[in-house]
Amino acid sequence: MAGTLPHAVFVETGVDAAGRAMAFAGELPGCAAVGDDPASAVAAVPARVTDFVGWLRAHGESLAEPVGNWYEVERAAAGERADGGRGRASFSLDELPPSADEFATWLGWAELAREELAAALDVQPTAAERLAWLAAQDAALASELGTPGPSDEAAAGLDRIYAARDALTTALFRAGPGGAGVRRALRLAIADDLRAVELISAR
């Protein structure tokens, strides 16, 4: 039955200092719900999917909302990077390279998410001080894809956020759809830009 189709959810635990969890909708890279624990994150996925699809449609994307139930299929914990930052989890789905069309589509989603963040920072530029983790993560993802991120002395605050994303975008284009880690990098770039917008708006 259409109403009982299963959809995969991938859960990452310990995504921040508070120990919260993120539940990622497997069919929609970058669509993720945050919860105080895995169960609450997974429970929030259906509503998040509706919001995510609506957001994309509002920006001209033609996208059908997945119908059915969402189930946790895999769980992994965030770790720690060599630079002391939070090393984000990888899932089995991340090993599947996107098609050329998917790659182009998801790059577009990442650009839309970054535009949302830029708009939020225009209103509250001092919020950039709370997003050092985002710049560090983009720089780390770029490095994993083979493109060095900005040096520690290169920029700070808002400038560093944009410099790190420029490095990640360059890395993604260089890697192309067949690059190892591309799906994971896009998933995190979209999800965490949108999460950053919510963190800014909550203040």
Description of each model-found segment:
Residues 9-13, 17-34, 38, 42-57, ...:
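Short, contiguous alpha-helical
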Residues 1-2, 118:
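Hydrophobic, helix-prone linear segments
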